[in-house]
Amino acid sequence: MVDDEDDITFDSPEEEIAHYREKYRQALDMLTDTRAELEEFQQSSKELEDEMEQELAANDKQQADLREKIKRLDAEKEEWRTKHIALQKMHSSTTSAMQREMDNLRSERDKTLVALRDLEMGNDELERNERVAISSLLDLESKYNRAIEEKTLLEQDLAQKDELETETQRLKDELREANEEISILKDQLARAIATPPSSVSTSSPIHDAACDLSRIHLSDDINASPLPPPVPSKNKSITPEGHSPRRGLSRSGTMSSIPVASPSTKRFSQQIPHSPSFSTLSRSTTSRNLAAAAGTPGSPALARSRSGIPQASPARGIVLASHQQTKSRGFKLLHDLQARLKATDDKLGGAKVPRRNVSNPASVFGVGKRVTSTTSTTSSTTTAPAPHARVTALAKDHNTTPTAQSQQFPGSGIMSPGWVLVGEGEGEDTPTGPWSMTLPAEPNSPLDPTFRSSSTTSNRSLPSRPGIPSPLASGSARSTTSGTAQRQAGQRPSSRLGLKASRRDSEARPLSPSMIPVPSFSSRPMSPDVYQPLRSATPTSGFSSFSASASTSNPPRPNSRTGKRNPIGRGPPPLSSSTRLHHQRSRQSLSGAGPTPTTGADKVERAKRGPRRSSLSNMDKPSLMSASSGSRTPSGRPTSVHVFRETPPPVPRIPSAILKESKVKK
């Protein structure tokens, strides 16, 4: 512009002044605008500066606040860091403590499990011991109940025994009084009848009248009493006239039931002063031959006949007649006793009681077969009395030959001595045995006298109980084996009196009547004359083997029973057809034979039998012992004993200390 202004040329100075004045005015306007803009700018910048200062102050304040906050947050951060570290330390310590506690709890748990296992094993052992104790307690209770039952049976049998002893003693007293009357009558007759003057004389009318009187009394007594027919034997009972009366008496092959004189009777007979005729009483009391008792050495006629001349005594027939009167009186007493027993059975009520076995009056009073021998001495033409109708009926029911039957069933024949048949009616056929099949079977008492451990009555042995020793097994087995051996060897039965037991049996309990060995039925028992050498210190040689066998077979008996021999109830009862069938089947089963075919009669007999009462009906039957002796106990015997099939196993006892030691070793 300056260049432009330099290039401008003015025409006049006024133009130039005017031009320069214009320019001045322009520059002044421009300055004024610039000053206005500057002031405006200064004012706006001042406002902006104020705003900037305010904003800066706010920023500074905010920055200070933020710095303050940062400081506070840093402090909080440090605090939380320390807290976190403390918490971490606490957590680690707590974790380690919990780990240690967990380890301790694990060890305690293991110990508790071991102790619990030991406790469980001990508990099982205690429970097993408790079961064994309970079973032992049941066993002891069954033994106790059985002992109570046996005690009750013993008391009943003792009461029956006392009653029978009182009745027997009364009969013995009556018999002794009758014997005293006989001795007095004999004494009076011996003094009243004069002795013939010469050694050889004929029979007087008094002798004939006495013989007739004795025959009349003898026939009346035989017809009045229902005697069984005589037992058939090898020897003839009727002797010819040429033989003496002692030689004419035959020794029967069966048992004799003549009662042995009690010690009181023997003492009484020794205290009575001996007269010439009273010696016959002592001989007739114990002698088996009552017919020979009339002609004893006290009679002067017999003393004269021993000198070589046979002479009949006039007092002999009268003595026999008086003797038969006494026997008829004894028969009346015996029948009165039987009537009383029957009345007692009727009073007992509706229960059927087995009929009591009473000793045979024929064998007690010396009638029967010996009566036939007695009558043969006076008259050989005297016939035997007619047998009773009941006896003949029972004899027809059995085998026709008694000898064959006695070989098949020894001691079971109809005429076995020791039994009497009380006639209650002609048509009645009730067996008198305790094993009657038609009656409801009562529980047999192990102490019953008919409960014999022999092959003729029962073929079963006592049951073997593993935990219960039977008090009757040992004695019955010993008595049965000895009785069987003696029966097979044909020896006499062992005596129950005056024999000392062997050392083996000295500690056994006293015998019950069921343990008494049954006497053999093939030979008659010893006479009372034989008892004297057996009681003496040195027995005779004839009975040495017998006493030796008896000492090993007989257990010791109480001293109270020594000398008391009760002849009542000796011998087996008569067998009926059902009983014979039962014995045949039992013998076949014991001998190993095959089973017998069941017939119609067997079914009828089985239907007739009532159910046997037994406490083993809902329990296991006890196993039976081997019947080596050929005898068994009837299965219907009341028994309340629980029988285990096998004994409980022993309890293993493992102490807990041993288990702990074994675990520690593992």
Swiss-Prot record:
Predominant place of localization: cytoplasm
Alphabetical list of Gene3D superfamilies matching this protein: 6.10.250.1080
Keywords linked to the UniProt accession: Coiled coil, Cytoplasm, Cytoskeleton, Microtubule, Transport
Transmembrane spans: none
Chain positions covered by the region annotation Disordered: 40-64, 220-310, 369-388, 397-666
Keyword match Plastid: no
Pfam families in UniProt: NUDE_C
Biased composition range(s): Low complexity: 275-287, 372-383, 449-465, 473-485, 536-554
Molecular functions per Gene Ontology: microtubule binding
Coiled coil: 14-195
Biased composition (Polar residues): 251-274, 400-410, 587-599, 614-638
GO cellular component assignments: cytoplasm; kinesin complex; kinetochore; microtubule
GO biological process entries: centrosome localization; chromosome segregation; establishment of chromosome localization; establishment of mitotic spindle orientation; microtubule nucleation; vesicle transport along microtubule
Locations listed in the record: Cytoplasm, Cytoskeleton
Key word Coiled coil present: yes
Family, as annotated: Belongs to the nudE family.
Chain's role: Required for nuclear migration.
Assembly, per entry: Self-associates. Interacts with PAC1.
Annotated PANTHER family: NUCLEAR DISTRIBUTION PROTEIN NUDE HOMOLOG, NUCLEAR DISTRIBUTION PROTEIN NUDE HOMOLOG 1
Full protein name: Nuclear distribution protein nudE homolog 1
